[in-house]
A protein has these predicted regions:
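Bacterial N-terminal signal peptides that target proteins for export
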Residues: 1-13
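Bacterial N-terminal signal peptides
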Residues: 12-21
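Boundary at the C-terminal end of the N-terminal hydrophobic targeting segment
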Residues: 26-28
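Low-complexity, Ser/Thr/Pro/Gly-enriched N-terminal "stalk/linker" regions
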Residues: 30-98, 123-131
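Hydrophobic alpha-helical scaffolding
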Residues: 89, 93, 248, 268, ...
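Aromatic-lined, polymer-binding surfaces characteristic
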Residues: 96-99, 104-114, 121-317
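Extended polysaccharide-engagement surfaces of secreted carbohydrate-active enzymes
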Residues: 320-572
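Conserved small/polar residues in nucleotide/adenosyl-binding loops
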Residues: 573-579
Length: 582
């Protein structure tokens, strides 16, 4: 396992834990996606081609359509985890709308390729058209009334529908009558022209307004342009947007996906200068973002909404929209396909035919209260890659491992520091792992949604090979310090302040939320086979603290415990697992 305990009266220097990286595998079962007739000529690592992506999309969508038996049935799935919504009847309509809008992220690209697609005996195009019409039909159980208050989840889902309606316009929008279009437009514009939140939410106003403007409807152009400029103002450089206030996958699966999609669908015609800026910002991510993934192409468990999983690769294919610089599409597609299979090939990914609320399986600490079961289909944005034609370089390039082939040499460690955000990405060629150090400065007391102060953000680092473990009440803490506070409770660090990155050393200070006299000066030094920590802890009275390692799997070896007394009053207890090579 992972812990050291320390008692100290004034100050202590904690130096060192070096971790060896372990690997494991999961046997395939019936409940998993299988790559049929893999093409190892074009894709020597995953076997995945564009046709396999289509099959993967159909596999994912089939589970949702198992709940659909008539055109009037709604995309409403069994609730999983008590903390998720709906918690009352009033929240059910928007949960159903989420299921509709987010499964359409998968369905729209499939329909563009195959308008006659049938699932569970239902013509998929007929189903979604029927549901779109019903949104503005007061007699339908799918009816969404016009906006009456402030920003709500309904805005997000209607904005998502606008993306899919444009992506497959000939199938989803054009066949509607003028009366049906006008009625749906009025419903959507009541939200799109309404208030929003100054984060990625502004994109949903943008897509509603841009789509309706594209279709000839009169919209609030000033509000549209204002939201676009505010979104661009959230850019911090090196491919990263700040999502008020965090850095996480929302930079990728929201800003760096929606920005280029908007530019391609609407922006080049409506606001060409703003469109070009979104594309330029997107291109900046090439030098950093792909390095977050492991050598094997796996994504990291990092940040909120991690149940969206492979939505993390959504922006990669969209680099095709910007031709200003060179992109290694063989590496980019290898990452995208590997991350997709990272989940689709695991039997725990689906339950009742629907993706689970978690990372690999149901896991409440990684799920937020704003999510419902249908929320998970945000992952479907990965299939926006299918909007690219078959001859796009993203699909035709031969898979490769990019810089992992020659540039990232074994025996070394490689850090990519991004000064605009203070993010640090570290690559370990010896193990193939990638690691992230990022922002966290949120108190539990002010974190009313209980996610920015939690394990989703507060770890010392996040590693592709070690999905994080939830902290326990008895000091079971992974990749963080725990301090026994004045209430006798174990309290982890979450109030970090970045100091510097120089000479391979990433420095942060931290204080305990409930006792600012407990101070940490942290120094992370990535090494080829792990991390050297040189940390100073200052306390005003005798205090018990512990340092947690990455959470490790217990494979075929037992935990070993050793105790060492270094110098009074300092003592250590170290729990380890014998390491094995990958």
């Amino acid at each position: 396992m992972r812990r050291r305990a320390l008692k100290n009266s004034v100050a202590g220097i904690l130096a060192l834990f070096v971790l060896s990286l372990l690997g494991g595998s999961v046997a395939a079962q019936e409940n998993v996606f299988t790559v049929q007739q893999p093409d190892y000529q074009r894709s020597p690592y995953t076997g995945m081609t564009r046709q396999h992506w289509i099959q993967a999309g159909e596999y994912l969508l089939q589970g949702a359509f198992n709940y659909i038996h008539t055109l009037d049935d709604q995309m409403y799935f069994p609730k999983q985890l008590d903390k998720t919504y709906p918690n009352n009847d009033g929240q059910v309509p928007v949960a159903k709308l989420e299921g509709l809008a987010r499964t359409l992220f998968v369905a729209a690209p499939l329909l563009k390729d195959n308008p006659d697609l049938v699932m569970n005996g239902i013509k998929v195009a007929d189903y979604y058209r029927h549901q779109l019409v019903n949104l503005s039909n007061p007699k339908s159980k799918s009816y969404i009334p016009h906006r009456k208050g402030g920003p709500s989840q309904t805005l997000l889902e209607l904005g998502s529908l606008a993306i899919s309606m444009k992506a497959a316009q000939a199938i989803l929008w054009d066949p509607l009558t003028k009366s049906q279009k006008d009625s749906l437009a009025a419903t959507m514009l009541s939200y799109g022209e309404g208030p929003t939140i100054g984060s990625n939410w502004m994109f949903f106003n943008v897509f509603i307004l841009s789509f309706m403007k594209d279709q000839g409807y009169v919209v609030n152009d000033d509000y549209l342009e204002s939201n676009l400029k505010k979104l661009l103002a959230r850019y911090r450089g090196e491919g990263w947007y700040n999502d008020a206030p965090a850095y996480d996958y929302y930079s990728a699966w929201a800003y760096q996906t929606y920005g280029p999609i908007w530019a391609e669908m609407f922006g080049k015609k409506q606001y060409p200068q703003l469109a070009q800026q979104f594309l330029a910002n997107q291109h900046d991510m090439v030098a950093n973002y792909p390095y977050m993934f492991s050598r094997d192409g796996k994504m990291n468990m990092w940040g909120r909404s991690i149940c969206y999983r492979f939505a993390s690769v959504a922006p990669l294919a969209l680099l095709e929209y910007d031709q200003s610089g060179e992109v290694n599409y063989g590496w980019i597609r290898r990452i995208a396909s590997s991350t997709l299979l990272q989940f689709l090939e695991r039997p725990e990914f689906l339950e009742d035919g629907v993706p689970t609320m978690g990372f690999y399986e149901p896991f409440a600490p990684a799920v937020q209260i704003y999510s419902c079961r249908g929320s998970v289909y945000w992952c479907g944005k990965a299939f926006l890659s299918l909007l690219l034609p078959e001859d796009a370089e993203f699909w035709t390039a031969k898979e490769n491992t990019g810089p992992w082939e020659k540039e990232l040499k074994k025996g070394n460690v490689y850090n990519q520091f991004q000064p605009g955000t203070n993010l640090l990405i570290t690559n370990y060629p010896n193990s193939g792992a990638s690691e992230m150090r990022s922002w966290c400065h949120e108190t539990v007391a002010k974190d009313w949604q209980k996610f920015r102060s939690t394990e989703n953000y507060n770890k010392l680092a996040y590693n592709t090979e070690f999905p994080w473990m939830a902290d326990g009440n008895n000091g079971e803490i992974s990749m963080n310090y725990g301090t026994k506070n004045k209430k006798g409770e174990w309290e982890v660090l979450r109030l970090y302040t970045f100091q510097s990155f120089k000479d391979g050393i990433y420095r942060r200070d931290a204080v305990l939320e409930t006792d600012s006299t407990v101070k940490y000066q942290l120094a992370d030094i990535p090494l080829p086979n792990g991390i050297l920590r040189v940390d100073k802890v200052s306390v005003s009275e005798p205090t018990e603290i512990c340092l947690g390692h990455y959470s490790l799997p217990r494979l075929n070896t037992n935990i070993q415990e050793t105790s060492r007394k270094v110098d009074r009053p300092v003592s250590y207890t170290h729990l380890t697992l014998p390491t094995t090579s990958r």
